Amino acid sequence: KPGFYSIQGNHEQMLCAALRDGDALAEYCWVRNGGNWFYELPKAEQQQIRDHWLPKLEQLPLVIDLYTVDNVHVGICHADPVFNDWQELLTALKEYKAKKRDDLIEKLVWSRERISLANKTDLLSEAYRIKGIDWCVMGHTPIRPTPYRKGNCLWLDSGAVFPGGYLSVLEAGKDLHCHQASA
């Protein structure tokens, strides 16, 4: 739907690797991270998911660069923008090749470095500012209280998959508003 955005994260990548490649290690990794539901489905439904959803999931963007109607520049990535400059990330995603690009993508969807440092230090919030953007919105690491903010970084993963967790949705306008509901 217009106004709703989805990006590719580590779970989407695990699903795609398991279903596309049929690699036993990829399947094992996906099952260990919640993918067991797929193998409990009838074979016909599994094939339907492969045929219909796999191409769509593989096309999800790794980052979203958007402007709200109030001209607020919001960058969205799954885990960590890796760089301290949003434009540098966008350029690297376009220009990096092969192994260097794969390493960047792995950090983009798996890294917990930025949130770990934010939790361990009392550095001023400005030390966590991503240049070239008003807000950088991330998830991947369940954290409470949610949303958690440091500089212009905002983490939204409120652990919806865990008991007591809830789903967070961000409404981006002139100000950012987080709405939450029990999962």
Task: Please give the residue ranges for each predicted region.
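Divalent metal-coordination and catalytic microenvironments
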Residues: 9-10, 38, 57, 78, ...
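Active-site neighborhood of divalent metal-dependent phosphoester bond hydrolases
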Residues: 1-66, 70-72, 102-107
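Conserved beta-sheet core of the metallophosphoesterase superfamily
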Residues: 116-181
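Conserved protein kinase catalytic core
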Residues: 15-16, 84, 146, 163
